[in-house]
């Protein structure tokens, strides 16, 4: 796949890429990638450490390409304020904004989980309980001693004490571990509860490794979640989380999201016609609607009145990155404006 930044000369690069795809054929696809913050990264100390032999333009290109491969691992390398996160971000107290954005980044990293044997220091420092120093120590320990093969080995990392381990352990995955629970988001403190749950449902850890516990949720519900939670010594929400993790050990929650929209041909503003159905990616959510990338180098606007249901704020139904179906309402070529709707014009 080819990643094209949405900044300077993006349109010309896209046309050149489409011509290349026509000539080469095969499975080659391209995607327009939001390059906000790529220039900030390319001029940073971190980029200079990662690519000392490259100039800033090549560093930006690498950052854009990596955003297509693994956006989370790449975006953690820049200050979230540099991404352009909202309508009034510069009107807010910058310290409060920074705290709020850092909290969101941390939540995202923790929700996905981190492979302790491949993660960069930039990604590790965003895990609860870790900071820049302990993240660097963890990577240095990994380079000196080889891959981690058990979660408890993380305790051997210099300056990473029991308290920090307690906070970070559930978010660090160890795929190389022979113990299947180390592959999951189950915290070491809940390992005993997970084993009690499996025993009560007539399953084993070997069954988890082999993917033979498809009916675990149904068995647990038959036994009664509250009674089972009491037997395992945890609350019902924790028990539910354990079941979810055991059913898909090592899963990446992002796998359940719609895949990015990859294209082979370029679309012009003049190609758009009212009523046309398109797939688009939400680029920004604002008070009066949402801007959606539909592949024509000009984001279209879905006004709040054209969302699928009545809401006080568009963020109740849409988030940046959502892949949605929209219909063209009107196109103003002179002013470069596109009106879109999420309400199917064919359904009455």
Language-model segments: which ranges?
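Non-cysteine beta-strand/loop elements that form the S-adenosyl-L-methionine
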Residues: 33-34, 117, 293
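A glycine-rich phosphate-binding loop feature that marks nucleotide/adenosyl-phosphate handling sites
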Residues: 7-9, 32-40, 81-94, 156-162, ...
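Single-stranded RNA-binding regions, centering on S1/OB-family and related RNA-binding modules
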Residues: 172-348
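Flexible helix-coil linker/hinge segments at domain or subdomain boundaries
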Residues: 1, 73-74, 336
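Long, highly charged, low-complexity intrinsically disordered interaction regions
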Residues: 49-147, 153, 162-198, 236-264, ...
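Duplex nucleic acid-engaging cores and interfaces of nucleic-acid transaction enzymes
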Residues: 1-53, 61
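A cross-taxa feature marking solvent-exposed loop/turn segments within ectodomains of secreted
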Residues: 10, 147, 333-335
């Amino acid at each position: 796949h080819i990643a094209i930044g949405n900044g300077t000369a993006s349109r010309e690069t896209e046309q050149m890429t489409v011509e290349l795809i026509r000539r080469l054929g095969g499975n080659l696809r391209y995607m327009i990638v939001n390059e906000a913050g790529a220039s900030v990264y390319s001029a940073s100390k971190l980029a200079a450490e990662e690519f000392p032999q490259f100039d800033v333009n090549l560093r930006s290109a690498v950052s854009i390409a990596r955003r297509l491969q693994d956006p989370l691992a790449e975006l953690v390398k820049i200050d979230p304020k540099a991404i352009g996160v909202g309508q009034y971000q510069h009107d807010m107290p910058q310290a409060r904004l920074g705290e709020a954005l850092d909290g969101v980044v941390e939540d995202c990293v923790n929700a996905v989980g981190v492979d302790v044997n491949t993660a960069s220091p930039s990604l590790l420092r965003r895990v609860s309980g870790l900071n820049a120093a302990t993240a660097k120590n963890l990577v240095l320990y990994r380079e000196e001693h080889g891959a981690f093969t058990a979660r408890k080995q993380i305790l051997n990392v210099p300056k990473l004490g029991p308290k920090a381990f307690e906070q970070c352990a559930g978010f660090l995955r160890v795929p190389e571990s022979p113990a299947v629970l180390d592959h999951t988001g189950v915290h070491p403190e809940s390992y005993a509860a997970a084993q009690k749950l499996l025993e009560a449902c007539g399953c084993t850890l070997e069954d988890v490794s082999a993917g033979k516990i498809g009916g675990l949720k149904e068995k647990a519900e038959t036994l009664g979640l509250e009674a089972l939670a009491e037997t395992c010594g945890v609350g019902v929400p924790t028990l539910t989380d354990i079941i979810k993790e055991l059913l898909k050990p090592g899963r990446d929650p992002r796998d359940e999201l719609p895949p990015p929209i990859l294209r082979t041909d370029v679309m012009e503003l003049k190609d758009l016609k009212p009523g046309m159905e398109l797939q688009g990616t939400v680029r920004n959510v604002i008070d009066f609607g949402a801007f959606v990338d539909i592949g024509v180098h000009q984001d279209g606007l879905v006004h709040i009145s054209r969302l699928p249901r009545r809401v006080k704020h568009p963020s109740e139904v849409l988030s940046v990155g959502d892949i949605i179906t929209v219909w063209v309402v009107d196109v103003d070529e002179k002013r470069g404006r596109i009106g879109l709707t999420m309400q199917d014009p064919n359904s009455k």
